[in-house]
């Protein structure tokens, strides 16, 4: 029998929440603003949790170098903020998993590369995150995932 864990940390995008459609919708809006073809869900699905840089790279392809990437990121984040939880859902079994951790008095938290202001906008949409003990966002500490600082700061 395994010992009871002292705590559990989860990633957010692509682990607890399926945010791919809302992230992809923001990407496609930015592409539309620049008269670029939209990007299919099947193309961006596995890239969505890589954040704005990865999405812009797949959406703009070789033409990304023709643009100010920081301006594109700002436009992307502005649009994503407006529609942060339209199609986002928790993955199957997550509510039950978190409820079980809570029932067993196992503290749990989230370590994400999503900026804090977006994390704080998104999490309240999901009741299952009410018992979350700690949230470390991409800009909470000096280093973000995959650097171990987020884990070692616990």
Task: Name each model feature, range by range.
Residues 1-46:
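Active-site neighborhood of HAD-like aspartate-dependent phosphohydrolases
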Residues 24, 28, 45, 49-57, ...:
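An amphipathic alpha-helix signature
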Residues 27, 94-124:
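Substrate-recognition element of Asp-dependent hydrolases with the DxDx(T/V) motif
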Residues 30-31, 51-65, 122, 154:
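Helix-loop "lid/cap" segments that line or gate small-molecule binding pockets
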Residues 32-38, 62-65, 103-104, 127-131:
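Short helix-capping segments at alpha-helix termini
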Residues 57-99, 104:
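Metal-dependent phosphoesterase signature
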Residues 86-89, 115-154:
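Substrate-recognition "cap/lid" segment bordering the active-site pocket of phosphatases
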């Amino acid at each position: 029998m395994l010992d009871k864990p002292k705590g559990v940390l989860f990633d957010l995008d692509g682990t607890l929440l399926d945010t791919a459609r809302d992230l992809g919708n923001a990407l496609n809006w930015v592409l539309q603003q620049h008269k670029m073809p939209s990007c299919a869900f099947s193309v961006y699905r596995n890239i969505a949790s890589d954040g704005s840089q990865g999405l812009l790279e797949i959406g703009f392809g070789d033409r990304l170098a023709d643009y100010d990437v920081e301006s594109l990121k700002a436009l992307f984040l502005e649009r994503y903020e407006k529609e942060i939880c339209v199609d986002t859902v928790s993955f199957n079994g997550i509510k039950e998993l978190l409820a079980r951790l809570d029932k067993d008095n196992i503290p749990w938290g989230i370590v994400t590369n999503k900026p804090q202001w977006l994390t704080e906008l998104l999490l309240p949409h999901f009741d299952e995150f009410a018992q979350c003990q700690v949230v470390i966002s991409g800009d909470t500490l000096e280093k973000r995932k995959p650097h171990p600082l987020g884990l070692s700061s616990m």
